[in-house]
Amino acid sequence: MRLRKTRKIVVSMKDMAASGGYYIASSADKIFALSGTITGSIGVLQWLRYQRAFGSLGVKMRTYKEGKYKDSLSLFRDSTPEEDEMIQKMLSDTYNEFVQDVAKGRNQTVKSVQNLAEGRIYSGQDAFRNKLVDEIGGRKEALEELSRLCQYDGEIPLYEEEESPFDRLFMMLGSKMNSFSSERIFFREFKNSPVLVILPQAIR
């Protein structure tokens, strides 16, 4: 929101801009999304526990810590009722701040954003109908809008993040793992996992 006081910000969403991605985008002057973009997810994220999987492989995890709650979000053990209560309080505060920031960025009421939140995901078209994004379009349309807002007739330079070696390797492996794609593994693991975490943390 501070950047909007000194410059124009236009967001172009591609395949996915959900949860933290939408949190960041919500402060822009204008948001463009593709019809099939996955966005929204103002709310919850499931948290995986790996202790059973590691146990089946004969792997045991030992934790050394200083502080009673230092490993409260450990992936390798179940949380205690006391930890659940503490974490839920923190997450509720984070969730409320998330909703309030989106409402402020999108110039909507908190109640209207709450009605769209609770972790729901939306396609680009659904997000447009619910005023979570401003226009259906891609990078070309977003750049045209940025030029208009800035009253700039020249060519806008593009700076794209270079893929890391890990990203390239992951893409190569993904193309050869049709039946074991990352998406299938991701959703299979999440299917029976408890909802423990609301993301993202507040962005300052």
From Swiss-Prot:
CDD domains: S49_Sppa_N_C. Pfam families: Peptidase_S49. InterPro entries: ClpP/crotonase-like_dom_sf (IPR029045), Pept_S49_SppA (IPR004635), Peptidase_S49 (IPR002142), S49_SppA_C (IPR047272). One of its GO terms (molecular function) is serine-type peptidase activity. It is an enzyme of class 3 (hydrolase). Residues 1-27 form the signal peptide. Its EC number is 3.4.21.-. Keywords: Hydrolase, Protease, Serine protease, Signal. Transmembrane segments: none annotated. One of its GO terms (biological process) is proteolysis. The active site is at S19, K70. Possible protease. May be involved in export of periplasmic flagella proteins. Belongs to the peptidase S49 family. NCBIfam families: SppA_dom. This is Putative peptidase PfaP. It comes from Leptospira borgpetersenii. The lineage of its organism: Bacteria, Pseudomonadati, Spirochaetota, Spirochaetia, Leptospirales.
